Regions:
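N-terminal transmembrane-helix/juxtamembrane module of multi-pass inner/ER membrane proteins
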Residues: 1-48, 60-63, 67-71, 75-147, ...
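Membrane-interface loop-to-helix entry segments
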Residues: 132-146, 226-248, 276, 280
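Aromatic-anchored segments of alpha-helical transmembrane domains
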Residues: 27-34, 78-81, 173-177, 261-270
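Membrane-interfacial alpha-helical segments at the cytosolic side of multi-pass membrane proteins
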Residues: 149-156, 236-254, 284-293
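C-terminal membrane module of polytopic membrane proteins
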Residues: 255, 271, 280-326
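Membrane-interfacial catalytic/cofactor-binding modules of polytopic membrane enzymes
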Residues: 178-248
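Interfacial segments of alpha-helical transmembrane regions
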Residues: 69, 148-181, 188-196
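Interfacial helix-loop-helix junctions of multi-pass membrane proteins
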Residues: 186, 230, 263-288
Length: 326
């Protein structure tokens, strides 16, 4: 019995040491990433730090609904940063952005004319902001819907949350490498900066936002984030993987989820934020995640067990030393 307690104590102390290391890492990583521009921290340092942050948060947070919220919040910030990093690095190296290839593909898909051009010609008045512009911009602005749905699943169907959240995270993971490998200008940027598509495509979202603020119309802007992160559409990839999760809970929920995917796909193409090929690539990313799940799940479950052991090490330490007894 005494030997078993000694072994438990040693094992628990090891996990507790790891947990303390993660606890120290979290604020350090947050500070490093937040100050990266001011300090001139290179992407090769920032990327590993922000990528490990959600795992560190999971390791120091006891298993509960709050743990899902904490990890989800850290992961969304991690995605935002990893989405911005390629553009930040590219500004320093002046690496060119791809412009022509999506236009060629979309011209084939659109029967000679890119779908964005067709939609804006048919449905827009380029001189003003219409009710349709506002409605479609509202759909685009609802990109948080998949994350709100995850919150609803957590409250109403918690047994589905590990798979649903894991697949959404994997979807974001698969989109970010493309922003490094093939930085692609969206339709509005290709039209405005390079005169592609006869300069016809406008950034409708800019006009809607300025109209809502009662600001004068402007034909150019300095976009925050990553204006060359068009391929693939993470917006559509996230919506599609969430629709798949809803379909597993109930067919009616699945119909609602896929209806949102259709509306969001129309919105990003109409607004000039994405090409149709970006949308199709986003759907392909979601499908790839679903197909790969059976092969990746054993590794993920093992990682989850390790993180659970680390997170519960404080309680185990109390029991091993006798402090947990009344």
């Amino acid at each position: 019995m005494q030997r078993g307690l000694l072994r438990l104590r040693r094992s628990t102390n090891d996990w507790l040491t790891v947990r303390c290391g993660f606890a120290a890492f979290v604020p350090a990583a947050v500070a490093l990433v937040s100050l990266r521009k001011r300090l001139g921290v290179p992407a090769v340092v920032t990327l590993p730090a922000i990528s490990l942050l959600p795992l560190a948060v999971a390791a120091i947070t006891p298993l509960s609904k709050w743990r899902y919220i904490a990890v989800g919040t850290s992961y969304m910030w991690a995605f935002k940063v990893t989405w911005e990093l390629p553009y930040e690095a590219r500004k320093k190296t002046q690496r060119p952005v791809h412009v022509r290839y999506p236009i060629r593909i979309d011209s084939l898909l659109g029967g000679g004319v890119p779908p964005t051009v067709r939609l804006q010609r048919a449905l827009r008045d380029p001189t003003t902001v219409t009710p349709l512009d506002r409605a479609v911009a509202g759909i685009y602005a609802s990109w948080l819907v998949p994350h709100l749905i995850l919150g609803w699943i957590l409250l109403r169907h918690p047994q589905f949350i590990p798979r649903a959240a894991g697949r959404l995270a994997a979807t974001y993971h698969l989109t970010t490498p493309f922003y490094w490998l093939i930085p692609t200008a969206p339709p509005w940027l290709a039209s405005e900066s390079s005169g592609e598509m006869n300069g016809e495509v406008q950034r409708v979202l800019r006009h809607v936002i300025r109209d809502l603020r009662n600001q004068p119309r402007r034909e150019t802007d300095n976009s925050p984030g990553n204006p060359s992160g068009s391929m693939p559409s993470d917006h559509i990839a996230a919506a599609a993987i969430t629709a798949m999760a809803l379909s597993e809970i109930d067919v009616a929920y699945g119909v609602l989820g896929w209806s949102y995917v259709v509306l969001a796909s129309f919105a990003v193409v109409y607004l000039g934020e994405h090409y149709l090929i970006d949308v199709l690539a986003g759907l392909a990313v979601a499908q790839t995640v679903r197909r790969a799940e059976p092969f990746v799940s054993p590794f993920v479950r093992q990682l989850a067990r390790v993180l659970k052991q680390i997170a519960s090490s404080t309680t185990k330490s109390s029991l091993a030393t006798g402090d947990g007894h009344p």
